[in-house]
Amino acid sequence: LIKADGTAVWLDEVPYEYGVAGWAKPKMNTNAYDHEIVIAGKEYKHGVFCHANGTLVYPVGGQYVRFEAEVGIDDTSSGGSVFFQALNTVPTFVAEELNNKYPEEIGMLGAVLDGLDTWLITPDASVEKQAADNAIARLKDGAYYSNVAKQIANEKDLNTQIRKYLELVEKVQELYTLQSDLEWLNVEAVKLAFADMKKQKGYDAAKYEPMLNELVRLEKKGFKGIYNGDEQAIADAKKALECKRAILLANPLLDADKIVAARFKVGSKAHQIMTPSLGTQANNWSNQESAGREGFDAEIVELSNLRGDIQMRQVYKPKNGSSIADLKLHWDGDRVMFTQTQDDKRWNIYEVNLDGTGFKPLVENDEPDLEFYDGTYLPDGRVIAISNIGYQGVPCVNGSDAVGNMVLYDPKDKSMRRLTFDQDANWNPVIMNNGRVMYTRWEYTDLTHYYSRIVMHMNPDGTENKALYGSGAMFPNSTFDVQPLPGHGSAFVGIISGHHGVARSGRMIIFDPTKGRKSTAGMVQEIPHRNRPIKEEIKDQLVNGVWPQFIKPTPLNDKYFLVAAKLDPHALWGLYLVDVYDNVTCLMQAEGEGYISPILVRKTKTPPSIPDRVKLNEKEATFFIQDIYEGEGLKGIPRGTVKSLRLHAYEYAYVKTRSDHNWHGIQSGWDIKRMLGTVPVEEDGSVIFKAPANTPISIQPLDKDGVAIQWMRSWVTGQPGEVVSCIGCHEDQNQIAIPKRVIASQKAPSALTLPEGGTRSFTFDLEVQPILDRACIACHNGEGKAFDLRGGKKDKLGYGTSYLNLHPYVHRQ
């Protein structure tokens, strides 16, 4: 920046008033990797690094008369292009003003442009032409409208040309919406739903059967003329869609006629966003603590008149720019629980009545570093929430994403107790029809962690915690947003997704664990693909490129569901009624907005309250195994082989601590293993023992020489005073125990035989190095050709010489 007298100041020396970048934040004098900025081989001591699309606003204040800059792409980039302009206005701010005044028009334009900044600062019609071309390219047949665009290109008057391009964009976008809706017009599916709804009390079949007949007639006539400007074809298509909508929304399950949901105003990016812009986490491995905490325009809304001109009423809107997450409707149907930030930006769970009154926090806790989110009501008035109470972090990101485990909280006396002691995230606790708690648990220890998010269920006090679906399988990677089907003991609906890639949303699946507990065995159906078999697919980014994308389903019964969805890459996030017959019917969507977490407002039966079984005055739990040889864990192992069990506890990575891939070893586990001791196995394979409660315990069956035959690669946690029992080793959860007297059931529980040296960590230095010292270092002493196996010396990562020399010869997975 140069003044009139010729003096100058470097831009990096002037603080900017406003700065955004397409990735990370604008940086002064360094590139993305914190090295010196280099453009075309030239190093720059002064410079601003800003990833596209970026905007920087500097105060000029009449001091400067000239601005000079060299603009280019940093040499560390693999390629690309750069567009740079200095302006006296901020296009982003102007775009926001336009969006507030004209949301429909700006939203439609934003659907075909990557941001509005370039459009607002381009003096000719090139951006409008590009918008029209982009819109036409999305049509199945764009020839007619391509000719219209060519005619506009010959227009001499610039203002007329710009106006006609924008009018064309609007018309083609409306046609594209019609095209998209027709893709979800499945007459056979409508017939099947109609036949089912006829059986429901309150469905007026006589009223809607003529509409079904009209729909059949129009569908046979066809709608190809919509691409040629045929107004009759367009009218027929709209009429057919109106018939479909009327038939399906007449479903008596919607007679309550009210839906509560979260509404997000997202502006011109509404067609491009994914669910992190609607308050979810930006990945599939973190909890709400890693989601955005501010900068949202979100509210809880109630939608009514669902079959007509939908009415919207605000229930609650945060005043601090927080998102709205984890909506849960109480069984009384008059209030909702949700997650938002407090004034200090920490997450907490709150409640508000649907009439807008009664807003209050549901967890009151004085600890300054605890957060609570993803809560659920319990039938007895208590609540369960996810919390960072363990101060753990996800190991592969060095603890930068905090881990959340479940806590039980009583609003009456403000008492709290931790329920789960898991290595990584718990998600979405929800009450099943039998009063148990269903949730998703991510397991990370000693296994392929891309594919290990398991649906669990337990009693509300944490007892009887067992796998419900997915244990021991690699498909699906993740199952989120599980919700029990009304009237079913164990069936549920959920969203399957990947590990990396698309975050939180994915494919919508109905599960029935009574049919199978792994992979596709218990997957009853994918919605909306009634006739498409579900195939096992072991893939990291499981749902990348998959459409529709679903999130937050709510079952109305076992056939009809409310869900938030984005039907294709260019669609808005809206609310839909979907069913097992493949119908997908939009209830609500709006330009510039996104909707999530739809719940039908109705009173439902409160599940039974399961009394607490824990004995909080005890420090141990009892573990009973009827027959260690039952189940796939020890399949093929001859009876009598297992003589004892070795028990170890996991010590998990703490938040924001070094814990990455090579921190504990090379090709090793993520966690420190703390040896607790051994217990005997009876001749008939039965075992009974006591072990510390509230401790994640893993088990290794040992032979007569103390050698591990198998590895649990998971953990079990007993609550204080609980008797944890199982049939065998990773037995099928659908297997029924055969009543029989076993040796262990007639004995008192065994106490742990402590390991040599007492309870301690299991490490190379303590277990392996003493053997090398006794048997190997006479020759392997670093003096001859034999590699060195002496201990003691460590490198900068803490690895000893013997460990580094030996590890290539030992496969440990």
Locations of the language-model features?
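Hydrophobic beta-strand positions that form the internal "hydrophobic ladder"
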Residues: 259, 336, 383-384, 437, ...
